[in-house]
Amino acid sequence: MREMMMNNMLNDVPTPWAMYFQDSATPNMEGMMELHNNVLFYLCVMLGFVTYMLYNVMTVYNKSAMAYKYMNHGQFMEMMWTTFPAMMLLMMAFPSFMLLYMCDEVMAPAMTIKAMGLQWYWKYEYSDFMVEKGETMEFESYMIPEDLLEDGQLRMLDVDASVVCPVDTHMRFMVTSADVIHDFCMPSLGIKIDAAPGRLNQTSALMQREGVYYGQCSELCGVMHSSMPIKIEAVPTVDFLAWIDEQ
C-alpha cells in the first residue's frame, strides 16, 4: 500500500470530463502549465476585485441615492484602475514572452524526426538512421480500427506503428504535409505545430521521463480528420538503439 502511494499516477492520455492539462513530460509543457496557473490566479484576483466593487456600488446606492452627490472625481481611484491592471498585464506578459521564445528555440538536436501528414495517416522519417538499402529509415502510421483493438489499447488513439524516442535527448521534429493542412499536436510534450504543404516547420522536445504519449491532428483536414492519432513512446537510450536495430 505504501509503495502504491509513493508512485506517481501520470495522466498522458485524454480522459472523459477532464478539466485540466495532461501531465507534462517536457520543460516546455511544464512552463505552459505554470504560466496558465499564474494567469488564472491573476484573473481570479481581478474577478474578486471587480465583484467587490460592483457589490459595494449596488449596496451603497441602495442605501442612499445621494451617497455620491458631491463626488465629481476620484484621483486615487483613477490612478488605481489604471496602474493595477497595467501591472497585472506586465506580470503576465513577461513570463509569456520568455516561454514563447523558449518554445521556439531549437537547441543543437541530437536527432531529428520528420513527420509528414497525409489524408489520413502520418508518415515518419528518422533522418539520422539508415536501413540496409542505404535509405533513411521511414514508416507509415495508421489508426487501429475499433474492431481490431486489443485489451488495453485506446479507441481512436492507438496506431499500428508508434514513434519511439530516447528520453533525456534533445529532439527536433520537422513537420510538413503532402496534401492539405494538418497539425501535429502532442499535449504532454507541449507541441502543437502546423503541417502545411510546401513548408517545413520545426519544433523541439526534451522528454524527461519514460512513457507513452498520445496526440492527434488538430487541424480539420477532411472527413477522416479524427483518424489521425499520434503515439510516441519515450524509452531509455539502450532500448531505443535496440529498437533501431530491429527496423
From Swiss-Prot:
It is a multi-pass membrane protein. Keywords: Copper, Electron transport, Magnesium, Membrane, Metal-binding, Mitochondrion, Mitochondrion inner membrane, Respiratory chain, Translocase, Transmembrane, Transmembrane helix, Transport. This is Cytochrome c oxidase subunit 2. Component of the cytochrome c oxidase, the last enzyme in the mitochondrial electron transport chain which drives oxidative phosphorylation. The respiratory chain contains 3 multisubunit complexes succinate dehydrogenase (complex II, CII), ubiquinol-cytochrome c oxidoreductase (cytochrome b-c1 complex, complex III, CIII) and cytochrome c oxidase (complex IV, CIV), that cooperate to transfer electrons derived from NADH and succinate to molecular oxygen, creating an electrochemical gradient over the inner membrane that drives transmembrane transport and the ATP synthase. Residues 56-86 are mitochondrial matrix. Its EC number is 7.1.1.9. It comes from Eeniella nana (Yeast). CDD domains: CcO_II_C.
